[in-house]
UniProtKB/Swiss-Prot annotation:
Subcellular localization: Cell membrane
Entry keyword Transmembrane helix: yes
Protein name (record): Protein PsiE homolog
Classification via NCBIfam families: PRK02833.1-3
Source organism of this protein record: Bacillus cereus (strain ATCC 14579 / DSM 31 / CCUG 7414 / JCM 2152 / NBRC 15305 / NCIMB 9373 / NCTC 2599 / NRRL B-3711)
Length: 140
């Protein structure tokens, strides 16, 4: 009986310990993403100074990568603001941005572009549903 009581005590602290580990890992990830975001800003400024032969696709790609870093950082901030909960809509924003980046980079095949556009349509539809009042518990 004594052993069973000790297991209950240990298992009651287990989720708390895992939550702390997750929080520390997300803080570290946020710091690393912030460093990469600043690196992307510096690289973007250097690309603007160069009036060379760089294609506009590379410049747009760097802007979209900046927004991907930014969205991940915002998602981590929202995680802590919303009592350790990731809002679904931020994952959808990241998915849409990633597909737009893919369209900018790989625009050779018309069939692939059509499939990417369909994927964006599905994600926007999911975003519309996720932003409805019925699904948004954070507005209450």
């Amino acid at each position: 009986m004594f052993v069973l009581k000790n297991f209950k005590i240990v298992f009651s602290y287990f989720p708390i310990v895992l939550q702390y580990i997750l929080n520390v890992a997300l803080i570290c990830l946020g710091v690393v993403l912030s460093v990469f975001l600043m690196k992307e800003v510096i690289q973007f400024m250097q690309e603007l100074k160069l009036d060379g032969n760089e294609s506009s696709y590379h410049l747009i790609d760097s802007i979209v990568v900046f927004f991907l870093y930014f969205e991940f950082i915002v998602m981590i901030i929202k995680y802590f603001q919303m009592n350790f909960h990731f809002p679904l809509r931020y994952f959808i924003y990241i998915g849409i941005t990633a597909i737009v980046r893919l369209i900018i980079i790989d625009h050779d095949s018309p069939l692939d572009l059509l499939l990417y556009a369909c994927a964006i349509f599905v994600l926007i539809s999911a975003l519309f549903i996720a932003n409805s009042k019925m699904m948004r518990w954070d507005l209450e």
